């Protein structure tokens, strides 16, 4: 019975991830368009489509996934076919398991494991690694260039991402996500104790999500879609779905690691935590979208130098601050 309950909770968490990932992705698109004063397709939509899709475009990310799923999948003849086909699937599996390690208002399956943060870090890395492998296996020059850019960006943003998460773990004296939440609930949000780690994490997320100024791997005007250029049909649908879930995952990880997971109320007011959690996720995406709309694209060498010169030192300063706070008994 316990196993059945865990399966039900896991399915529930995944459905929450799909719903919230879709909404956050839509929110990012909407904000980005508004900041650039662009109009959406609703103004020129056929009347027959409006009856099916409704007046809102909030499900547009899922529409994109569903549309691509119905398209024909073309595998390049000169590609490493097995690697090319399996890479998007492994990336999707990695982000799906990572979602189960990330609490949503105390709701989690694997977040209480003593090594949850280590597993989460490896799974987040796995997504980028298999995108690199897929692009390199495509035999396309655009895919190869995109894979190389993805690899360089991976080296730049992965260190501050992991360092920031471990800065939070040091303060909580645990690698369990549930313990990190409980620490913040009984003390202060970690963003107040260690703003350096939160700052570094924010810029690392920009790179992981390929948002400006770090959208170099799949810059459309330069290399079409980068490592995803040769993907089509169901495989491209899987990639879109993975990116949507990654939007949810990284937003949730930031809120959990630095903003108490939105758990500020107890007792009869506990349901308000759900609204706080959602509000913090939307606020985080708003900040991401603002930077995305305001910044031009860096060259890959500029992006790597930016991370190496500014974000890495801030991330290591956050790690040092966490060690000092713990060793001096402040926390």
Language model region names:
Residues 1-331:
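Alpha-helical transmembrane segments of multi-pass membrane proteins predominantly involved
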């Amino acid at each position: 019975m316990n196993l059945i309950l865990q399966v039900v909770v896991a399915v529930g968490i995944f459905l929450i991830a799909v719903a919230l990932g879709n909404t956050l992705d839509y929110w990012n698109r909407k904000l980005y368009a508004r900041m650039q004063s662009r109009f959406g397709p609703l103004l020129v939509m056929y009347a027959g489509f409006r009856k099916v899709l409704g007046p809102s475009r909030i499900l547009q990310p899922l529409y994109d996934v569903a549309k691509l799923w119905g398209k024909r999948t073309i595998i390049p003849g000169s590609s490493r076919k097995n690697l090319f086909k399996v890479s998007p699937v492994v990336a999707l599996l990695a982000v799906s398991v990572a979602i189960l390690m990330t609490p949503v208002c105390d709701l989690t399956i694997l977040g209480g494991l003593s090594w949850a943060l280590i597993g989460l870090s490896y799974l987040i890395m796995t997504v980028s690694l298999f995108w690199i492998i897929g692009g390199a296996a495509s035999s396309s020059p655009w895919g190869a260039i995109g894979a190389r850019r993805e690899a360089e960006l991976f080296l730049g943003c992965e260190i501050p991402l992991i360092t920031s998460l471990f800065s939070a773990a040091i303060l909580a004296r645990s690698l369990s996500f549930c313990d990190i939440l409980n620490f913040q609930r009984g003390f202060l949000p970690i963003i107040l104790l260690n703003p350096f780690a939160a700052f570094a994490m924010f810029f690392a997320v920009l790179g992981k999500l390929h948002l400006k100024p770090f959208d170099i791997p799949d810059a459309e005007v330069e290399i079409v879609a980068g490592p995803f250029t040769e993907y089509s049909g169901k495989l491209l649908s899987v990639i879109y779905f993975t990116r949507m879930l990654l939007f949810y995952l990284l937003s949730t990880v930031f809120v959990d690691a630095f903003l108490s997971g939105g758990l500020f109320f107890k007792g009869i007011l506990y349901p308000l935590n759900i609204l706080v959690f959602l509000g913090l996720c939307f606020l985080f995406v708003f900040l991401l979208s603002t930077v995305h709309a305001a910044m031009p694209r860096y060259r890959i060498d500029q992006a790597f130098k930016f991370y190496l010169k500014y974000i890495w030192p801030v991330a290591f300063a956050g790690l040092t601050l966490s060690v000092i706070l713990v060793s001096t008994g402040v926390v």
